[in-house]
Amino acid sequence: MKKESMSRIERRKAQQRKKTPVQWKKSTTLFSSALIVSSVGTPVALLPVTAEATEEQPTNAEVAQAPTTETGLVETPTTETTPGTTEQPTTDSSTTTESTTESSKETPTTPSTEQPTADSTTPVESGTTDSSVAEITPVAPSATESEAAPAVTPDDEVKVPEARVASAQTFSALSPTQSPSEFIAELARCAQPIAQANDLYASVMMAQAIVESGWGASTLSKAPNYNLFGIKGSYNGQSVYMDTWEYLNGKWLVKKEPFRKYPSYMESFQDNAHVLKTTSFQAGVYYYAGAWKSNTSSYRDATAWLTGRYATDPSYNAKLNNVITAYNLTQYDTPSSGGNTGGGTVNPGTGGSNNQSGTNTYYTVKSGDTLNKIAAQYGVSVANLRSWNGISGDLIFVGQKLIVKKGASGNTGGSGSGGSNNNQSGTNTYYTVKSGDTLNKIAAQYGVSVANLRSWNGISGDLIFVGQKLIVKKGASGNTGGSNNGGSNNNQSGTNTYYTIKSGDTLNKIAAQYGVSVANLRSWNGISGDLIFAGQKIIVKKGTSGNTGGSSNGGSNNNQSGTNTYYTIKSGDTLNKISAQFGVSVANLQAWNNISGSLIFAGQKIIVKKGANSGSTNTNKPTNNGGGATTSYTIKSGDTLNKISAQFGVSVANLRSWNGIKGDLIFAGQTIIVKKGASAGGNASSTNSASGKRHTVKSGDSLWGLSMQYGISIQKIKQLNGLSGDTIYIGQTLKVG
């Protein structure tokens, strides 16, 4: 009778009181405004993140969905967008945690067996949940990690191939003891030196750590685990097992998997950098190369490259970009010292813009300044500004003091023969890499090119290590660059002609002055880009016995008269390495083999020397075409400078020089010079008939990737399509030629 007289509410409360702690520890989905959820750990649509309570929760706690914030870091999971979910995960699965003992009927958005009633709104306190891990396999060719993950549970019969990581997050309430600014400062301390040493963006790594770890609130990212990026496996034998979603046999299941356990955040950042720099599924081709600073124009190119590779979430780059923008993380993309250690340090005693004999001239950056604007103002190249001030990109700050002119005694470039750093005649000079060093920084410090540093030390990329000993100057018997002792501007029979670079010089300007191609200048002097220094001595004409250009008649590698010489690419090869090996320019290798970027493959056969009858570029006098006549060509739809240069056996640099082309933009119907006669001089005029080559954006595409694919610069793609930023959309049609 007493039971019948009880009201519905009383009966409900009585039922709730009967629940055991084990029942309350069933998997629940927790979203709150204090919880930032990264969709990196979810396949396309955000999946629920399960949490197990460590103590009995209030009987009427209500689980609320978190609204999407302006930064786009929180998304409400929906069952409609869960990819391939033919059967919703339930807590009676054989792969759930041991505490999940009863069946459940909830969908993936609420995988708990029963939600508490809404009579009370008591929130779940911080630290009361031991969160589960959300995990996703990157979109990549099948491969395993360099460090195999330990064996998991016995029921793990299906192995999901992982390219890099299974991005795992565990979530609890955001810690009230650490503010976002404090967390950012802690990340910056680790990210800055590691990113700088590995040619990565500190801003992108920090944003990844924030998004992946929920601002350090995940159990996986907290002590004693310190795993900010959810990398699976073990680290120095240490791992921690946590629950993660896996899509096996057509259904989403929760499995216990091992995740790496680090001594501190520093090791977590180092490990992630290692992943971004070394992951490869084909010899010589690095999966995340599109996120490296040297291959991008801004952090946005890097985040776009990671989308669809590091994470399947199509909005991954937007989430990272939002965090970077909202918290000004780009401020950490410059060296932590804030000054130049390459081309000469800032002298506090000299006034900005005060040019004194023997000293540097400085300029203090004002609002609205850019490197291009400052370079034009002082008549120097952007490359020089970067070199003198240790700047790797275009980021400068208001109030920053820059070197804008080098004094007579401040030359760090060229071929100085001083005895610094124990440089002895006939022997090499060595340098031991310190924390924060990069190849660009060391090259600027010792006045050599990055290409020479790579060649002298057998480095194929940009990865160097603290404590590594590098050759930074070659002894008298081993000089391979442009620092030979010859009379400057003194052309002698049988010897090279040298030129000492002055302030304001560029490779294009010098090439035009001496009637040679930019490609030849690069090849003769071991220059891989456009970076030159005031005071640097370079070869501008090769003597009769010193030709190392693209048409030298060496007999190596089965070179036969009148035929091309081929080389089969081996693992670890790069275009720079091959060009140095065969004494040709990278530009020629690209032109002869129709390569638009730097991507080559092990086993690929490429032309490394052009035969006498194959139209190879004469690197001594590239403008010498017998008969005194100029050959012209009318561009057809689909043509590119690389394609035309390969067709006519000339360099892209020559095509640009002969036709006044500054970038890669050409038009169908345009007539250009493809061979110069002895007396030819004028530039061909161009028409405005645009070609119709277009590309429809797919998942994972980026402006950098399209530029590599179609042999066109990022700036040209933006110009053709009226893009002001780097954001492109799936399904968008872009002009690419």
From Swiss-Prot:
What segments bear the compositional bias annotation Low complexity?
67-117, 420-429
Q: Where is this region: Disordered?
A: 1-28, 51-132, 335-360, 409-429
Comp. bias regions, Basic and acidic residues: 1-13
Q: Where is the composition biased (Gly residues)?
A: 339-352, 410-419
What SUPFAM superfamilies does the record point to?
LysM domain
What EC number(s) is this enzyme filed under? 3.2.1.-
Residue ranges annotated as compositionally biased, kind Polar residues, are 118-132
Lineage top rank: taxon: Bacteria
Protein's job: Hydrolyzes the cell wall of E.faecalis and M.lysodeikticus. May play an important role in cell wall growth and cell separation.
Give the species. Enterococcus faecalis (strain ATCC 700802 / V583)
Q: Where in the cell is it found?
A: Secreted
* Segment forming the signal sequence: 1-53
> What protein is this chain from?
Autolysin
Protein family according to the UniProt entry:
Belongs to the glycosyl hydrolase 73 family.
Q: Which UniProt keywords apply?
A: Antimicrobial, Bacteriolytic enzyme, Cell cycle, Cell division, Cell wall biogenesis/degradation, Glycosidase, Hydrolase, Repeat, Secreted, Septation, Signal
Comment on protein domains = LysM domains are thought to be involved in peptidoglycan binding.
| GO CC, alphabetical | extracellular region
What Pfam family is a match, any one? Glucosaminidase
- Stretches that traverse the bilayer: none
The record's GO molecular-function terms, alphabetically, read: amidase activity; hydrolase activity, acting on glycosyl bonds; lytic endotransglycosylase activity
Query: What residue stretches are annotated with the LysM domain?
Result: 361-404, 429-472, 497-540, 565-608, 631-674, 693-736
Q: Which GO terms describe its biological process?
A: cell wall organization; defense response to bacterium; division septum assembly; killing of cells of another organism
